[in-house]
């Protein structure tokens, strides 16, 4: 399940399903926030309609995920979008290993599935991995100053090529 609010339910999930493996799908903070801003969610995501609120929400998500990692060491895998784009097969094998699943060549052809998919990204699941969305936030950099400022505690820890110009030294 990839609902944006589910990170807050990890403790409950681990209580009712103690052997559950948690996969945290990660992306560059600005790309993640811009993606949420562009998506019209059904309900329960009112934070996604304002860039400042998105930034604050993302900081809370980051804080909570650090807490869950400390509370459940080795039971949460951070699956980084950018790493998957660069090394899809290697990262997919790591994911399957974490889940205790066997490798199948079809894992690289996920887009060939015939089953119904009901998510905000259902169209993306029906095509090969698209690299054009990586660092897409750079297209909006001159318009997202408030978001950059809000996320600066996280962005300052990134390599310079992943930082907004305003935060580079």
Model-assigned labels for residue ranges:
Residues 6, 27-32, 84-86, 116:
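Conserved nucleotide-binding/hydrolysis micro-motifs of P-loop NTPases
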Residues 13-37:
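Conserved phosphate-donor/acceptor-positioning beta-strand/loop module used by diverse small-molecule
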Residues 1-3, 21-26, 78-83, 96, ...:
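Short beta-strand segments
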